[in-house]
């Protein structure tokens, strides 16, 4: 009898614990709620914005993925990150692929489409939301390659057609008058071929630092090649650099080397006002600007802190909603401007000389923000 009582108590305890566990494991409300297929289809698509980023391992794709993490708001807004080949294919997708509303691309890609491909009405069809961090041209080669000239007639991989490097890298060699044997394969495979001697260099345009390069072990026999900035690159490119701290295993015997960099841009299709697609983009931009502070802290990419929302892109038109949001922010920040102006004057007084071009001004602005953050 006693054993039966104990058994019943144990069974009751197990049932009780199981019931509590079930109560704790609540199915999310968004999954529980049912509706007709038509209603669900409408709800899922009403505020979904497609943004094409780039290669899955690239920084551009991480930017888009982080926008989704920071801005997604159930059925009110959903960012759909789309993987692609890179900056050049992104602009193609923004122009022609169904479901794409925005894309990360580059200023030189836009100019190439406008002047060389002569894409009809590009200036009116594609506008921008904000500038993104610059992307540096990385050229990785075996140690015997000491300059770009050493790659004349050699095999250089630019990544699959459509990547930023397949356009920017090709333009760089063309402008320098260096003919190379162009290879267009994925970069992980190209790295293996570089190590085995089947290709002589790989080119990749991506914001630094990137694990693809920084994780190359020491004594690999590979290094990043110095790219001197000349007048040939003054139109759409700026001076960049790589340091020993960023790539400790790829700058043997050097603390830093030069490279060229190109401006990345968050581009948007200029949908007709009052259309459904325009409303989607409008809501996305409102969320982006209103939650901008979210991107300034970990775990978000540190390059977000380099972005100046007010910075312009020469030759491009800012999307009207972005311009309106920017003006609202500037009005809200008006009380801070006098103090910031005084801070900037103090900062400038400690500089050896005034900036000579846009690249120097942007660099000075970043340093000013860092200096200001330390003071306040």
Specify the residue positions occupied by each region the protein language model found.
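Bacterial N-terminal signal peptides
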Residues: 8-18
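Short beta-strand-to-loop elements that line the ligand-binding cleft
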Residues: 77-86, 179-187
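Pocket-lining segment of extracytoplasmic ligand-binding domains
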Residues: 107-108, 117, 178-276
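Bilobed "Venus flytrap"/periplasmic-binding protein-like clamshell domains
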Residues: 48-71, 135-192, 196
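An extracytoplasmic/periplasmic, membrane-proximal ligand-sensing/linker region
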Residues: 189, 195, 206-220, 224, ...
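Ligand-binding clefts/hinges and TM-proximal coupling segments of bilobed small-molecule sensing domains
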Residues: 26, 161-172, 240-314
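Pocket-flanking alpha-helical
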Residues: 65-69, 80-121, 191-193, 210-216
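Hydrophobic/proline-rich hinge and linker segments of small-molecule sensing/allosteric domains
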Residues: 30-34, 127-146
């Amino acid at each position: 009898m006693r054993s039966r009582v104990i058994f019943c108590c144990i069974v009751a305890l197990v049932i009780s614990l199981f019931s509590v566990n079930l109560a704790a494991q609540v199915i999310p409300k968004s999954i529980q709620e049912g509706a007709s297929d038509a209603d669900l289809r409408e709800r899922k698509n009403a505020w979904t914005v497609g943004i094409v980023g780039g290669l899955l391992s690239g920084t551009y794709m991480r930017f888009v993925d982080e926008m989704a993490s920071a801005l997604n708001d159930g059925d009110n807004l959903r960012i759909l990150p789309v993987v692609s080949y890179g900056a050049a294919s992104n602009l193609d997708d923004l122009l022609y692929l169904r479901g794409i509303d925005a894309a990360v691309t580059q200023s030189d890609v836009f100019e190439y489409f406008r002047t060389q491909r002569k894409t009809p009405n590009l200036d009116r069809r594609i506008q921008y939301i904000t500038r993104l961090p610059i992307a540096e041209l990385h050229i990785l080669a075996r140690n015997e390659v000491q300059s770009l000239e050493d790659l004349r007639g050699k095999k250089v991989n630019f990544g699959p057609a459509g990547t930023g490097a397949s356009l920017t890298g090709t333009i760089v060699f063309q402008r320098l008058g260096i003919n190379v044997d162009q290879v267009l394969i994925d970069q992980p495979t190209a790295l293996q071929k570089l190590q085995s001697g089947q290709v002589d260099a790989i080119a990749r345009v991506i914001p630094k630092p990137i694990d693809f390069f920084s994780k190359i072990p020491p004594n690999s026999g590979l290094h990043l090649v110095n790219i001197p900035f000349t007048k040939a690159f003054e139109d759409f490119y700026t001076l960049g650099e790589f340091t020993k701290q960023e790539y400790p295993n790829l700058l043997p015997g050097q603390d830093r080397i030069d490279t060229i960099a190109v401006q990345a841009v968050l581009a948007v299709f200029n949908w007709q006002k009052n259309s459904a697609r325009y409303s989607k983009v409008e809501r996305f931009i409102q969320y982006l600007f209103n939650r901008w502070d979210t991107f300034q802290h970990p775990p978000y990419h540190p390059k977000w802190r380099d972005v100046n929302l007010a910075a312009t892109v020469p030759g491009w038109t800012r999307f009207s909603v972005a311009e309106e949001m920017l003006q609202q922010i500037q009005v809200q920040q008006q009380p801070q401007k006098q103090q910031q102006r005084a801070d900037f004057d103090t900062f400038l007084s400690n500089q050896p000389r005034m900036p000579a071009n846009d690249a120097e001004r942007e660099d000075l602005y970043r340093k000013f923000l860092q200096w200001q953050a330390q003071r306040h």
